[in-house]
UniProtKB/Swiss-Prot annotation:
SUPFAM superfamilies linked: Pectin lyase-like
Transmembrane stretches, start-end: none
Signal peptide: none
Protein keywords: Repeat, Virion
Taxon lineage: Viruses, Duplodnaviria, Heunggongvirae, Uroviricota, Caudoviricetes
Species of provenance: Pseudomonas phage PAJU2
SMART domains in alphabetical order: PbH1
Annotated protein name in UniProt: Structural protein 2
Presence of the UniProt keyword Repeat in the record: yes
Protein's job: Structural protein.
An annotated GO cellular component: virion component
Amino acid sequence: MAYDTSAFPLGSKDPRVLYNNAENMDVAMNSVEQERWMDRGPQRPPLPRWTYWGMEQNYNRFISNSAWELPPLVYVDGSPLTVERSSQVIERDGNLYSVKLPASFPVELSGTWSADEPLLVFRSDQSLRQELAEQNGGTLVGWKRTQLSASIDTIQQLADSIPIRVWEFAELVSDKPSPDPATWNWTPAFQAMVDTAESYMQSSGAKQITCYAGPGTFLIDSIVWRSGVHMYFGGAELKAHPDSIDGNSLINATLKLSDIGFYGPGIVNGDKDSFDPEHRQHGIHCVAKKVKVKDLFIENIGSSSVFSLGDGVIFRPTIPEGDFQCEDCEVSGCTFSNIERQCITVESGFNIRILSNGFYNSTYAALDIENAGYTMGDVDGVIFQGNYIDGCLYGVTAVTYQPVDAQRNIVCGGNIYKNVMDAYHFRGCSNVKVGYGDIAEVSRYGAYIYSDGATTVSNIEISDFTTSGGTYGVYAQTTSGGSFNRIKLSTLKITGTSTSPITVQSTSGLRIEEVDVLINTGAGVVIQNCASPIIRNLKMVGAVTLSVPAVSFIGTTTNPRVGGLDIAGFTVGVSVTTSATTTIHSLSNNVFAGVATPWSVNPGNYIKGQFSGTFTMNAAASMNVNSVGMNVTSSVVRLIPTNAAAATLQAGSKMAWVVNSASSNNVSFRVQTADGTAAAGTETFAFVIENL
């Protein structure tokens, strides 16, 4: 340094200090000859500091000395050996050693092993240590799952704690057409995974266990499932192997199981279009309780021409015994596509929940509820909610050939149907509730309810249901002596039907309330062979004037009750053409806007309620006043003068009165002067008919 600055404190601004600092920094940063430079103190002896170049050299030496030098020094008993550096290794009898640190090199070994051995460290695993430290070092470690019995303290225990994975059993796969795992037949590996999970539960006392598949494509024939085993797909696609036999199920859970689950994201792919048209299969086949199928794509299941088998997910009883029914099962968040038969079939089940799924482009129903056989299947409690259906033939079919109450307590709501023939199709069911926000675009029936006499249908409610298109909005049909017991239709919006918005046959306990209809062709509401039906607050609008009744009571219908009707665009409001005379109850006022004939009834029918109108007397002693409400034995008619001439007439000997015996049922009543002489013909009256 040019100046002695040892007396100046740190931070001094003295020019000499600044000069020395500049010189030191120049050496520290730019020298390629000096590894060290001396600082200026101060107020202590100067210390050596690393130059930048010196730090580089020191680092390079460290890297160089970190590896072992090969070939090793050979130790020969009885011969001295000098070890110059710590990186040198010594070989004796095939084993490697290094000098134990710390040590002062060079180290002189005597050649007497008993004296030299304490100075050395056994190093035969050093190369393995370095290989294990590499990025792929984990591939050198073997592992076989064991049962945990203590807290996790080792890598072995940590590995034992993770879900069982199918790749643990890849060694069992023998059918490998190519190195690509997507071409292998993984059935043995999946079966071993499931069986191992079952064994683990039996030995550990666990109630359920988790397995893991994905990601990747795995070709399989059929996996026989076990109770308690839950599998997370993790992006896996389980795909039917090209050699799969006819009639199998990709996942076969039919051994009277309990507590099983299949969770996405993942795919169950039957790959049906690559098989012979006669090839049949199921996706997930369950004879089980406590089942969950969630967040999966289930696609390409079934056969092209054979309609037995072919379901995406099916719940069944034991066949033929019928001694086991599915229970507490859920399918949610799944997407079904290109399913040849039913996307989901319930042939047996208590508390079955089908929630928030998508159903697309499949041959038959999104959900088919159909008891297996005559006495084997039992269905009690099915919820179908929040689903989206597009391109299936049916939305929900619930069909049984069993006796009363074989299928009951079915609730459907909040579903959307597009491009379907029928949204709902019920046969032989009881306690069914449909609607609750449903929207349906159909080509035939919004809801079809059927009874043929072999089974009965009871307690059907359709509420808050919007349907458009098709032939019928709601069609309750009976044949061969069939009948319905209690059907309630409320808060419906029906548009664009070609035959009838609502037709109901052979029902006791029919209620139609708060229904809004807009049509431009076909008939109106048709009630046939029903006992005491009630229609309230029905709004019927013909988009063009339709020459049909808005509401028709026909056949053996008895005691119909109507009220609050709002009808426009029809030539006839309410038509009663029953085969026998009956009493019609008018429950409240009705509005017939532009309807030429508000009421059309067969003579003899008695319409309870109140009818009113006006007329002008003829210049005669008597005249007939038309009114469909007239009943010759029961009607009470009041005449109300509405001008001075009528008041004068009523105050004198010519007072007009109604002669029931000369009137005609449902056609007209006879008005006659009291003295039998002619009225002036200028008298105007209002009338009120009371049918009590």
